[in-house]
A protein has these predicted regions:
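Conserved, mostly hydrophobic/aromatic
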Residues: 20, 45, 87, 96, ...
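Non-globular sequence segments
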Residues: 99-161
Length: 173
């Protein structure tokens, strides 16, 4: 098998078998909107058969690391569209990795009013970097209530729809 030979992966035909793994890069703006530097970054890697994006928050509550992107509002979708267009112009394919960080978060890295929620109210060990205060201890999350689960599922459904509207070729969960 030649790593440079095409590969059919579901509905996608990749030009080669090289797949770029997702990497958290912290290059979005303070509103979780992808920036121009991200357009260049992904364009430069479009010769891979498939790019899996960095983790993209499906909602404001899904954010937790500083300067990570979302895909839950029109500005974010438009910015991702610029990125996917650049990748496609170079012959590449790209899927969105949807990521809710759960308990690994800092309120300093989240929009005002969003919460740190997780499957249980168990604090993760360790620290997380914030632009405002450097390394900070991970916070106590609030346990997600059973009746809240449908709303989280809807956030993922909406984020999937937004990813396709933003030009992604697929979604990774």
């Amino acid at each position: 098998m030649d790593i440079f030979s095409p590969l059919t992966l579901g509905a996608l035909t990749l030009r080669n078998r090289i797949i770029m793994a997702p990497m958290t890069r912290s290059r979005a703006d303070a509103d979780a909107v992808p920036t121009d530097i991200m357009v260049d970054y992904y364009r430069q890697r479009a010769s891979a058969g498939l790019i899996i994006s960095e983790g993209i928050a499906p909602s404001a509550d899904g954010l937790g690391y500083c300067r990570t992107p979302g895909i839950y509002n029109p500005r974010q979708i438009e910015a991702w569209s610029r990125i996917t267009s650049a990748v496609h112009a170079e012959g590449g394919s790209m899927v969105a990795q949807l990521l809710h960080v759960g308990r690994v978060a800092s309120a300093l890295n989240k929009p005002a009013g969003s919460e740190t929620v997780a499957p249980s109210a168990v604090r993760a060990r360790g620290e997380i970097y914030t632009d405002q205060g450097g390394m900070q201890p991970l916070e106590q999350p609030r346990a997600l209530e059973l009746e809240e689960i449908p709303a989280v599922l809807e956030q993922y459904r909406s984020a999937t729809e937004n990813a396709f509207a933003g030009g992604f070729d697929g979604v990774a969960l």
